[in-house]
């Protein structure tokens, strides 16, 4: 197994969410891996209890801008459900080249549930990065969920990438790879699906703690730390500022990508 240096250095790696197809017909089709993972996420998302749309300003649903003379398109879907305060899926496309899928499910701090996150970075040359994880925000991973993850077979990916400097937010189950073939791309989708199934089972079975419980306060603090760490990705902010403006970039990062958990 080859370990590849360079962690999360794509200019828009952490643009997150799951999206509908872009209205623009210019440029190549969405990469098959992005399409496959997006479809699988939508399929699993529909199984969550009490799923409903997350309030979203219409101007943030489908966004376009210019970056270095190329059109930057971003499309977002946001939902919430019992146990998860925000489910965000996004696909971003820059001209006919770079494509990014990002998905993140943030738990309600009253529930002992982890954060689900997945990202794919694609270009005409192929997939440069694919990452999936369930990041705990409690002191430990819930036992049932831990057992579910431990039972999942981990594919023998040939190229495993190094985590970024702020990678302490991830769990021991994080998989950050560069798929070497279409077979490995299929393995990655199936692995992400396994993580989603384990999470959904936990969401269905979970019961909330009181808002003032020590466990809730601790999970709220940990989730806030997760969001702060993600906001430190200066490349994401730089790309958004260049394509739009600093004020818009701040709003997108704070309200869409890494919105802090509401006060308890």
Curated annotation (Swiss-Prot):
Catalyzes the four-electron reduction of biliverdin IX-alpha (2-electron reduction at both the A and D rings); the reaction proceeds via an isolatable 2-electron intermediate, 181,182-dihydrobiliverdin. The keyword Oxidoreductase applies. The keyword Oxidoreductase applies. Belongs to the HY2 family. Signal peptide: none annotated. It catalyses: (2R,3Z)-phycocyanobilin + 4 oxidized [2Fe-2S]-[ferredoxin] = biliverdin IXalpha + 4 reduced [2Fe-2S]-[ferredoxin] + 4 H(+). PANTHER family: PHYTOCHROMOBILIN:FERREDOXIN OXIDOREDUCTASE, CHLOROPLASTIC. It is an enzyme of class 1 (oxidoreductase). Its EC number is 1.3.7.5. Transmembrane segments: none annotated. One of its GO terms (biological process) is phytochromobilin biosynthetic process. Keywords: Oxidoreductase. This is Phycocyanobilin:ferredoxin oxidoreductase. GO terms for molecular function: cobalt ion binding; phycocyanobilin:ferredoxin oxidoreductase activity.
């Amino acid at each position: 197994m080859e370990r590849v240096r360079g962690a999360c250095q794509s200019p828009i790696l952490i643009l997150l969410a799951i999206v509908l197809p872009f209205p623009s017909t210019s440029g190549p089709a969405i990469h098959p891996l992005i399409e496959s993972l997006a479809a699988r996420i939508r399929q699993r998302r529909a199984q969550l209890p009490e799923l409903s749309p997350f309030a979203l300003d219409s101007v943030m649903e489908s966004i376009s801008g210019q970056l270095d003379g190329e059109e930057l398109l971003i499309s977002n879907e946001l939902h919430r459900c019992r146990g998860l305060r925000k489910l965000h899926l996004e696909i971003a496309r820059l001209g006919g080249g770079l494509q990014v899928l990002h998905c993140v499910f943030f738990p309600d701090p009253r529930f002992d549930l982890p954060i689900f996150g997945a990202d794919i970075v694609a270009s005409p040359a192929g997939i440069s990065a694919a990452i999936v994880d369930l990041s705990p925000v409690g002191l430990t991973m819930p036992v049932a969920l831990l057992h579910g993850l431990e039972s999942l077979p981990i594919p023998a990916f040939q190229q495993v990438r190094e985590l970024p400097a702020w990678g302490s937010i991830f769990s021991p189950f994080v998989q950050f790879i560069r798929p070497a073939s279409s077979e490995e791309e299929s393995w990655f989708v199936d692995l992400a699906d396994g993580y989603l199934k384990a999470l959904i089972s936990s969401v269905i079975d979970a019961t909330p703690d009181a808002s003032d419980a020590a466990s809730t306060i601790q999970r709220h603090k940990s989730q806030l730390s997760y969001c702060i760490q993600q906001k430190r990705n200066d490349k994401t902010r730089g790309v958004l500022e260049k394509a739009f403006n600093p004020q818009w970039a701040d709003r997108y990062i704070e309200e869409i990508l890494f919105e802090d958990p509401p006060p308890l």
